[in-house]
């Protein structure tokens, strides 16, 4: 077997396993099925998974956007960021998951080098915007409930500014590989594209880009989420102590605590695989690894287009009620009254 150190690869792909040929073009992920990387069962199973994520992710995020447009009461400035996240998720589902479904079915990157860059960029942009939207959601809730700025009123223009900020952050993280700082290449089983996590010591300066992503797109937003939600929980517990006789306040405090735990865990499930894999590659330069494992971070990230809307939208009683009406399903009167009551309770929380 010949190691990759002895094989010179083109700039548009790299295969991080030993190869038994000098003619790497014959194994190009843009030209031939990658049967040497895994059995057909693995490729077809991944194709089926990507199809499910494409259909479910597209449907749930389109429904979120359509529901917001139809029902005026959902067009609250505090819901702007949820719609912003739905748009970002829709980009990932419609470009990333759909193309992966096709490519895994053919067992190679049928889009070619240019299509790979486009798919990698759009999926990265949508993913980064969604990631920063989670941090903004935490920040907005901290700002509104904990009131660290006193009588500051969070208005529509502030919400729009926060949404715009997520796209600026997303572009800062997704544009560099297009202009020479890292690059977009086929990743994992070579049927999806993303930033080059694999190669080191070359003209693309991948190590510095990976560290930039780890700090700017993982450590910073995660710190924001942990800080804001910990402050929010502290405020709620203080309010619950002050209203110890109020069963509804105690119930609201428990529900919010449970939701915060779910939100933080969901963030970690989505982005820890990418972060840990990138750091492992940097600290184990030149080591080969199982490409099936390298495919996991991309799959988990694309799955977030489904489970994040479930957590942030479908578990929102107001959104859920409107979606039921939009789909012609009977709305539960108890649920509607519960929605109104929970909204009232939340509005009472926080320092006066």
Curated annotation (Swiss-Prot):
Protein name per the record: Blue-sensitive opsin
Positions where N6-(retinylidene)lysine occurs in the chain: 302
Record GO terms (molecular function): G protein-coupled photoreceptor activity
Distribution of this protein across tissues and organs: The color pigments are found in the cone photoreceptor cells.
Residue ranges crossing the lipid bilayer per the database entry: 43-67, 80-105, 120-139, 159-182, 209-236, 259-282, 291-315
Source organism superkingdom: Eukaryota
GO biological process, one term: cellular response to light stimulus
Post-translational modification: Phosphorylated on some or all of the serine and threonine residues present in the C-terminal region.
Entries under Pfam families matching the protein: 7tm_1
Cellular compartments annotated: Membrane
InterPro entries in the cross-refs: GPCR_opsins (IPR050125), GPCR_Rhodpsn (IPR000276), GPCR_Rhodpsn_7TM (IPR017452), Opsin (IPR001760), Opsin_blue (IPR001521), Retinal_BS (IPR027430)
Glycosylation sites noted in the Swiss-Prot or TrEMBL record: 23, 206
UniProt keywords, alphabetically: Chromophore, Disulfide bond, G-protein coupled receptor, Glycoprotein, Membrane, Phosphoprotein, Photoreceptor protein, Receptor, Retinal protein, Sensory transduction, Transducer, Transmembrane, Transmembrane helix, Vision
Keyword match Isomerase: no
Family: Belongs to the G-protein coupled receptor 1 family. Opsin subfamily.
N-terminal signal peptide: none
Membrane topology: Multi-pass membrane protein
Stretches of the chain found on the membrane's Cytoplasmic side: 68-79, 140-158, 237-258, 316-352
Region of interest (Disordered), ranges: 332-352
Extracellular side: 1-42, 106-119, 183-208, 283-290
The keyword Ribosomal protein appears for this protein: no
Function: Visual pigments are the light-absorbing molecules that mediate vision. They consist of an apoprotein, opsin, covalently linked to cis-retinal.
Cysteine pairings via disulfide bonds: 116-193
GO cellular component: photoreceptor outer segment; plasma membrane
